[in-house]
Amino acid sequence: SSDLVAYADMQYCQQKLGTRFVMHADASHYRHQFTIDGVDYDLSQNKDDEAMAAYAKWIVNQVLEPGLDGVDVDWEGWSSSDLVRLIKELGKYFGPEGEQPDKLLIVDYFSGTPPTDIIPYCDYIVQQAYSNQVGFLTQPSNFPPEKMIYCESFGVFYADGGQLMNYARWEPSKGRKGGCGVFFLGRNYYSSSGIPYNEFREAIQIMNPAISE
């Protein structure tokens, strides 16, 4: 089936190319219902400490069962305090402070900067954009630049890379950013250059130039 082919592709990329795949989890007003250890939860009705710990455990299971490399928590809607509680729970398992530090713990956000309390527990914090622009890029106060990843939305500009190259070139005034990215990356397969993923490949070379021996 197509699912088996996709799973085999993921494993090949993990094992041969070093690509890491993470689960998308919500800290927003979606996907609030889940079951763990035979108990049903609905975070839209109750986000007490027990429910938050259960949500973290459910996420961990979703990551480990298929062999993913971590989780990206999409923060768009929850309060800052609820996000911190979830990340502290997830941080017991994944990320720099977790039982399995090789598993990535990432938070992504759009408008308001997340609370700095999450920093020790996270490998990366991703700043998203929903437009084809670069001028707004800023390093958020008190966040380590090496943990920050800046992502834009291709929209209809996937054929020439949109602002991806500018994102790759941009650096904060102090330090070096953790990286950049786009949504959806797959669209750049149809690069107007005729080379699949041409602009994305160039962005990688800008940030991590190949070494000539």
For the regions a language model picked out, list residue spans one by one.
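C-terminal domain-boundary segment and adjacent tail
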Residues: 205-213
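Chitinase-like catalytic core of GlcNAc-active glycosidases
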Residues: 2-167, 174-177, 185-206
